Amino acid sequence: MQREEKQLEASLDALLSQVADLKNSLGSFICKLENEYGRLTWPSVLDSFALLSGQLNTLNKVLKHEKTPLFRNQVIIPLVLSPDRDEDLMRQTEGRVPVFSHEVVPDHLRTKPDPEVEEQEKQLTTDAARIGADAAQKQIQSLNKMCSNLLEKISKEERESESGGLRPNKQTFNPTDTNALVAAVAFGKGLSNWRPSGSSGPGQAGQPGAGTILAGTSGLQQVQMAGAPSQQQPMLSGVQMAQAGQPGKMPSGIKTNIKSASMHPYQR
C-alpha cells in the first residue's frame, strides 16, 4: 500500500512539473500576444506553438507511461465545504479559486461534461452511426481529394511568388530599338531621302528632286502670269493633270517649260 502511495505521489509530482512548464509557456505566449502584437512575427508565433505542442506531447507520454497509475481509478472527495475565503486555496490556485463552496465543487470536480454538451455528443454519435461505411469512405476520399487540390494550389502559388521575388522581371523590349524608333518618328533621325528610279529625265540630271520641280513649276506660273495672262489656265491644267496622274513623273512638255523658265531673267 505504501509503495502504491509513493508511486502515486511521484507520478503526481512529475505531472505537476509538466503542467507548470506548460502553464508558463502559455502565460508567456499570451503576454507576447497582448504586449508585442505590433512587432510580433509569424516565425516567433510558430515557435511558440511548436513549444506548446512539444510540452503537450510530453504530458501525454507521462500519463501513458506504464509506471504511472491510472488516475481515473482515484476518487476525490471534498471533506470540507465552506463559503468563507480560504487563503491557502487562493495561494494554491494562484487566486483563481477563492472559496471552496457548493457552487464551485461541481465545476472543479466534475468527471462528466455538462448535460448540454453530453446531449450534443450523443446526437453527433447517432448521426455518425446512421452513415454507412461505404458512404463514409466516399466522403472521406472526396474530402481528402479537395484538401490535396487545395494544398497543391497553395504550394504552387508559394513557389511562383518565391521565384518571382528571387529573379527580376524579364525585359520584353530593347531600349536601344525603342529610343531609335521614337527618334525616327519624332525627329526623323536616321531616315534617308529616297526616290524611285526613273523619276528624273535626261534634262533633269542636275535637279535634286520633285520638290525642286514643283518649285520651278510655281516660278514658271508666275512668269507666265506676268508675261502672257492668256496662257495661265492651260499651264495650270497641265500641272494639275501631271500631279493627279503620275506624282513621280512629269510630262516632257512641262520639263521644257521649266527649262525655259529657268532661263528667264527674273529667275536669276
Curated annotation (Swiss-Prot):
InterPro entries: Mediatior_Med8_fun/met. The modification Phosphoserine is found at residue 82. Residues 142-151 are annotated as: Interaction with the Elongin BC complex. GO terms for biological process: positive regulation of transcription elongation by RNA polymerase II; positive regulation of transcription initiation by RNA polymerase II; protein ubiquitination; regulation of transcription by RNA polymerase II; RNA polymerase II preinitiation complex assembly. Residues 1-28, 133-163 form a coiled coil. Residues 200-209 have a biased composition (Gly residues). Keywords: Activator, Coiled coil, Nucleus, Phosphoprotein, Transcription, Transcription regulation, Ubl conjugation pathway. Component of the Mediator complex, which is composed of MED1, MED4, MED6, MED7, MED8, MED9, MED10, MED11, MED12, MED13, MED13L, MED14, MED15, MED16, MED17, MED18, MED19, MED20, MED21, MED22, MED23, MED24, MED25, MED26, MED27, MED29, MED30, MED31, CCNC, CDK8 and CDC2L6/CDK11. The MED12, MED13, CCNC and CDK8 subunits form a distinct module termed the CDK8 module. Mediator containing the CDK8 module is less active than Mediator lacking this module in supporting transcriptional activation. This is Mediator of RNA polymerase II transcription subunit 8. It comes from Homo sapiens (Human). The gene is MED8.
